[in-house]
């Protein structure tokens, strides 16, 4: 498939689930049924063994997204057969190699594997902890010498899976002519199989080889063997990650069902918030792994020849999936209590499988470190001169097919624009700027037509894809562009586009784009923060007007705003969610007063706004009267999507690298290990953000799963901020700009700002409650 056919992939997933459910795979695994050759042929008959093999080599050519869907279902069902070990690794390697001479032996072997007639493993590893082929040559390596028209192998291979019930192994060997790949039939004289079991009962072995003689047609390849093996192993890691995601999803589902049916202390176990939040945190790891896998497969499909990027992606995904699978299944045992520790309880079976897969082909720690070594360092904050020539305004098109433009060109254009037009005095400011400080920049973007990157073109936006939006955000952060007052752009605009009337869109959208109208949000009230539906600010109908009386608080930069979109209570006789309306208010109206709130950082970023019988035209109600709650939830979705943007984490990482480079911390293994973990967290945040940004761009409702994005983004930002304070040493407590790199490091700002973000848009604790109830389905949540 050239393009990813998601509908076809879901059909493949459904078909795989149906096939697996015809047998009780859990019982088959308990009975060690992995050596059932007839069932292996059934697996081959549905196309799984040749699914990712190119059609030109006799496979289905359906690609890795389809294979991942199958492996996820295999993990959920607990298929005992070694689909990765005897399917993915062998077929991928054989499809990738350049045959040595006649391609016939390779083609016949590949065909036999795809038809299920041969079960073949891959023997590549020479020592514990090895992540790439040939990495430990000389420790337990296999050597080959040519003798009398045959090949003689000597040496050892370790941790070979499958290690039993196989017809043979693909094996790497080193000789005078370099590395080579051979097919080693099982039972070859001189080969001793030291068998052992994995945690889940999967058969594995070490191979001891002493003067094993192979015929000439056993030589499969010479050129590029190590690279081909590395590629096969990386795809194996991606597919075992899909299997780990399936394991984690199933144990979470089993745990939810168990908690919903069991009671203690006179209450359902599912009603205990401590258990709810533990399940939500486990689910977060699972969704991060799933999104990371999807992101990696998309990136690899777009640039299949980039070996370094593939390796980094495989390690990133394996590190997250191993953590997700082990943590979720470990939690499932805890939540099931004593029964979870027994063999008869299915969650223990999943736990053992997660332990096996999590360690095989490299564990989470090893892959986190590999990812840290392979992933490109964040670009340092842009200097005034980055080697690019300044450009005239004519070189900055107001409109173009931005999504078709090569990303490097798009980013370079943004950098030139920022350098040409953004005020140098406002770069890298660690607090929110007021309208009088930033309005000229807002007007510049407005004139350029770049003020609304995410809006559709028909409403004056750039219609950027999520990938281009992220590029826009990253380049703005890199240059130090401050965030302008954007409540109208980020929140109200999308609401009016979806829910407003034509008259309302015509009246209000142009003012948002031009900067003529500056909007503030009016949601929170005293005693109605996360419990937003408890709001008391009321609007009483009086003819063609509504009379508003009450108070709003925590309204960002409302002292600078000209207008406010707000929630008001318009009916007190119904349940609290049903009597709320969404209203647009001119803050110049008589009866409006404002009082700034000084935050712990010393800045007046928020306001209290008071309404004393403020008259508002009834035409300013968005949607139906008393039907504002659904709009409110949609707007909160946009707000949480914005809170979940990776830009804050990206900026904090840049500052960490600025200090780390100057202090020599990148040579400290303890520091780089911690940094690699946080970089992985940030990368997976970006992957999760893309999923929800795609939904928003398509105009689809943002689901309650969005709560996970808000939690992960803000808590990742907080962790990064804490590391920044730590490595800044004494300056970690200084409220000043530091002289690292280009002098644009503010050690305190990311941490302090992240603390606020974990509270706004619904506290992270409330987000966990939402997810527990609306997504996991925990009763009593």
Write out the residue ranges for each language-model feature.
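Short glycine/proline-enriched turns and hinge-like loops at secondary-structure junctions
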Residues: 62, 133-138, 162-166, 464-466, ...
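Short Ser/Thr-interspersed hydrophobic loop/turn segments at strand-loop and sheet-helix junctions
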Residues: 47, 71-74, 184-188, 211-213, ...
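A short core secondary-structure module
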Residues: 123, 150, 154-192, 545, ...
């Amino acid at each position: 498939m050239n393009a990813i056919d998601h509908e076809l992939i879901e059909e493949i997933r459904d078909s795989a689930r149906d096939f697996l459910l015809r047998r009780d795979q859990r019982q088959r695994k308990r009975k060690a049924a992995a050596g059932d050759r007839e069932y292996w042929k059934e697996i081959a008959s549905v196309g799984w063994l040749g699914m990712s093999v190119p059609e030109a080599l006799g496979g289905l050519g359906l690609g890795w997204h389809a294979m991942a869907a199958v492996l996820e279902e295999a993990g959920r069902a607990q298929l005992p057969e070694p689909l990765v070990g005897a399917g993915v690794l062998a077929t991928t390697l054989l499809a990738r190699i350049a045959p040595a001479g006649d391609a016939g032996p390779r083609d016949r072997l590949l065909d036999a594997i795809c038809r299920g007639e041969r079960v073949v493993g891959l023997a590549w590893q020479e020592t514990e902890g090895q992540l790439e082929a040939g990495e430990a040559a000389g420790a337990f390596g296999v050597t080959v010498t040519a003798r009398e028209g045959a090949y003689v192998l000597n040496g050892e291979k370790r941790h070979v899976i499958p290690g039993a019930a196989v017809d043979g192994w693909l094996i790497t060997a080193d000789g005078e002519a370099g590395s080579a790949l051979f097919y080693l039939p099982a039972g070859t004289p001189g080969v001793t199989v030291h068998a052992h079991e994995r945690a889940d009962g999967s058969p594995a072995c070490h191979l001891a080889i002493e003067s094993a003689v192979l015929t000439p047609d056993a030589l499969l390849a010479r050129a590029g063997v190590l690279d081909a093996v590395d590629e096969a192993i990386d795809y194996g890691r991606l597919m075992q990650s899909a299997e780990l995601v399936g394991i984690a999803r199933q144990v979470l589902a089993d745990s939810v069902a168990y908690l919903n049916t069991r009671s203690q202390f006179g209450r359902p176990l599912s009603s205990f918030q401590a258990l709810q939040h533990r399940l939500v945190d486990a689910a977060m790891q699972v969704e991060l792994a799933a999104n990371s896998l999807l992101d990696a497969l998309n990136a690899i499909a777009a640039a299949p020849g980039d070996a370094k990027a593939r390796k980094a992606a495989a390690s990133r995904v394996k590190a997250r999936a191993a953590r997700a699978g082990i943590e979720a299944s470990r939690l499932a045992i805890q939540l099931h209590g004593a029964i979870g520790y027994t063999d008869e309880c299915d969650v223990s079976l999943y736990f053992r499988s997660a332990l096996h897969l999590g360690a095989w082909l490299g564990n989470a720690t090893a892959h986190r470190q590999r990812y840290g070594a392979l992933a490109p360092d964040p670009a340092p904050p842009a200097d005034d001169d980055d080697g690019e020539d300044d450009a005239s305004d004519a070189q900055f098109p107001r409109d173009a097919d931005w999504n078709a433009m090569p990303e490097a060109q798009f980013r370079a254009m943004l950098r030139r624009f920022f350098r040409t037009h953004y005020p140098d005095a406002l770069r890298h400011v660690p607090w929110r700027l007021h309208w009088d400080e930033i309005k000229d920049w807002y007007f510049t973007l407005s004139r350029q037509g770049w003020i609304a990157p995410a809006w559709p073109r028909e409403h004056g936006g750039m219609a950027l894809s999520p990938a281009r939006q992220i590029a826009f955000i990253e380049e703005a952060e890199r240059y130090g562009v401050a965030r302008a007052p954007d409540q109208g752009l980020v929140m109200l605009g999308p609401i009016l586009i979806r829910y407003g009337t034509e008259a309302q869109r015509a009246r209000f959208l142009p003012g948002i784009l031009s900067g003529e109208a500056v909007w503030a949000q009016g949601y929170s009230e005293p005693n109605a923060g996360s419990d937003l539906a408890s709001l008391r600010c009321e609007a009483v109908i009086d003819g063609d007007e509504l009379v508003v009386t009450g108070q709003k608080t925590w309204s960002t930069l409302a002292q600078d705003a000209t207008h406010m979109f707000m929630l008001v209570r318009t009916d007190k006789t119904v349940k609290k969610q049903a009597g709320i309306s969404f209203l647009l208010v001119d803050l110049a109206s008589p009866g409006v007063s404002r009082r700034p709130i000084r935050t712990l950082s010393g800045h007046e970023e928020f306001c209290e706004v008071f309404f004393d019988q403020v008259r508002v035209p009834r035409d300013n109600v968005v949607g139906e009267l008393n039907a504002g709650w659904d709009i409110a939830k949609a707007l909160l979705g946009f707000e949480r999507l914005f809170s979940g943007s990776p830009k804050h984490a990206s900026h904090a990482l840049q500052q960490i690298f600025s200090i780390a480079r100057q202090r020599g911390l990148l040579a400290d293994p303890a520091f780089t290990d911690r940094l690699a973990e946080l970089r992985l967290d940030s990368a997976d945040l970006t992957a999760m953000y893309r999923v929800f940004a795609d939904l928003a761009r398509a105009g689809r409702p943002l689901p309650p799963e969005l709560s996970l994005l808000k939690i992960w983004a803000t808590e990742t930002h907080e962790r990064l901020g804490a590391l920044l304070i730590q490595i800044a040493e004494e300056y970690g407590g200084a409220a000043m700009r530091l002289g690292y790199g280009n002098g644009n490091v503010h050690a305190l700002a990311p941490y302090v700002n992240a603390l606020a973000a974990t509270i706004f848009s619904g506290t992270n604790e409330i987000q966990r409650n939402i997810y527990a109830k609306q997504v996991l389905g925990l009763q009593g949540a």
